[in-house]
UniProtKB/Swiss-Prot annotation:
The name this protein goes by in its record: Large ribosomal subunit protein uL5
Lineage per the UniProt record: Bacteria, Bacillati, Actinomycetota, Actinomycetes, Pseudonocardiales
Family as reported in the entry's similarity comment: Belongs to the universal ribosomal protein uL5 family.
Keyword Electron transport: no
Main function: This is one of the proteins that bind and probably mediate the attachment of the 5S RNA into the large ribosomal subunit, where it forms part of the central protuberance. In the 70S ribosome it contacts protein S13 of the 30S subunit (bridge B1b), connecting the 2 subunits; this bridge is implicated in subunit movement. Contacts the P site tRNA; the 5S rRNA and some of its associated proteins might help stabilize positioning of ribosome-bound tRNAs.
Transmembrane segments: none
Length: 187
C-alpha cells in the first residue's frame, strides 16, 4: 500500500516561516494571534447577460471550476428588476469561496503566473481596500489563467477576486499582501 504524502503549499510555508515573523517585527504585536493572515479568497463571476440567455451561465461555471478547482455556487437574482428583464430566482452569476490549501495554491498561481500574463499590467491599485484590511480587485478576462485554453473561450468574462484577511487596518492588509507577492502600484 502506498501512502500519499500531503504537500503543503509553498506560499503557506513561506507565510508561516518568514512573513508572520516579519509582520510581527514591523507592527510589534503583543500576541502571536494578532498577526494578520489570509482567511479566504472569494472569486465571483457576474454574468448579467444570463438573464437573456441561460446557456451563458454554463460557460462561467465551467471556467470558474477550471480556474479554482472547485465547483462554483450559482448565484440567483434576489428580486425582479423590470428594466433589466430580470426575474427573481434567475441565475445571474457564479461564486467560489476558497479556504485552506486550495486558497494558498490559488493565491500563488494568481500572483506568480496569472497577473504577470496581463497585457500592459502595471500593478494592482492600492486603494481598493475596504477599511478592514480586505482587498477586492477585478480582472477583465479569464484568459490570463494558464488552465483556460484560449481557443476554447466562447466569450471573455471578467471576475472579481476578494482576499479576506484578519488584518484590522488597511495598512496591515497592504503589507501582508505585498509580502505574499501582490504587485501593488507605487503611488
Amino acid at each position: 500500500m502506498t501512502t500519499t504524502e500531503k504537500i503543503v503549499p509553498r506560499l503557506k510555508t513561506r507565510y508561516r516561516d518568514e512573513i508572520r515573523q516579519a509582520l510581527n517585527e514591523e507592527f510589534h504585536y503583543s500576541n502571536a494571534m494578532q498577526v494578520p493572515g489570509v482567511v479566504k479568497v472569494v472569486v465571483n463571476m457576474g454574468v448579467g447577460d444570463a438573464a437573456r440567455d441561460s446557456k451563458l451561465i454554463e460557460g462561467a461555471v465551467r471556467d470558474l471550476a477550471t480556474i479554482t478547482g472547485q465547483k462554483p455556487e450559482i448565484r440567483k437574482a434576489r428580486k425582479s428588476i423590470a428594466q433589466f428583464k430580470l426575474r427573481e430566482g434567475m441565475p445571474i452569476g457564479a461564486r467560489v469561496t476558497l479556504r485552506g490549501d486550495r486558497m494558498w495554491e490559488f493565491i500563488d498561481r494568481l500572483v506568480t503566473i496569472a497577473l504577470p500574463r496581463i497585457r500592459d499590467f502595471r500593478g494592482l491599485s492600492g486603494k481598493q481596500f475596504d477599511g478592514k484590511g480586505n482587498y477586492t480587485f477585478g480582472l477583465n478576462e479569464q484568459s490570463m489563467f494558464h488552465e483556460i485554453d484560449p481557443d476554447s473561450i466562447d466569450r471573455p468574462r471578467g471576475m472579481d477576486i476578494t482576499v479576506v484577511t484578519t488584518a484590522n487596518t488597511d495598512e496591515e492588509g497592504r503589507v501582508l499582501l505585498r509580502r505574499l507577492g501582490f504587485p501593488f502600484k507605487e503611488n
